[in-house]
Amino acid sequence: MTVTPRYLDHGQARRIYDRIGRYQDTRPLSERRAMDEIAWRGDFYNAAAVLEFGCGTGRFATRLLETKLPAGAAYLGLDVSPTMVGLAREALAPWGGRTRVELSDGSTTLPVADGEYDRLLSTYVLDLLSPSDSETLLDEAYRALRPRGLLALASLTPGSTPPSRALAGLWKGLWRIDPRVVGGCRPVELAALIAPERWRVRDRLTVTRSALSSEVLIAERL
């Protein structure tokens, strides 16, 4: 019997992440390593304006502001969860007018001007979105970024070792039955979503810890 995938709608995703709240910061080792790679490879030292789609609690933005971003760099975070938005605003309050965190209605259409940003960051979001929403988000990222701006992504991904492939298969099987069981996320291949006529992939790697794999991808807007 074929099970038709059922992606979470925006309301379901909002409720899940409202419940998760601060627990989102207790990430598995593979996710923490993926975030380390993005911080290192995203050339944030030279960024002037950063947009994060799915900012969560603001923990990664805090790290960037403390250790990577220039003193004058601006930051905008968007999230579908009111709980996450509240936590992120609290975390980023020390940076005052340099930062904004806004509640998203769940749309992947970005409320920003063309070419307004030189870094666009989205981690563990594309593995939650439907294919059509993912396509829209990447179209919007292309619109929002300046030429040579960088897109930084991380996602759950199919494994590269026998244990990680087995876990990814089990995870995707559970997701097909009921995506809420796994928080709405499933393993995806980020590189397959990137249009080569629009983006040049600068870095791509898979990080595996305890059989859980994440893909990290940095692409330059052409």
Write out the residue ranges for each language-model feature:
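Short glycine-centered segments of the SAM/dcSAM-binding site in methyltransferase folds
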Residues: 49, 148-150
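Class I SAM-dependent methyltransferase SAM/SAH-binding core
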Residues: 51-53, 57-108
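A short glycine-rich, Lys/Arg-flanked "PGG" loop and its adjoining helix->strand segment in the class I
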Residues: 135-147
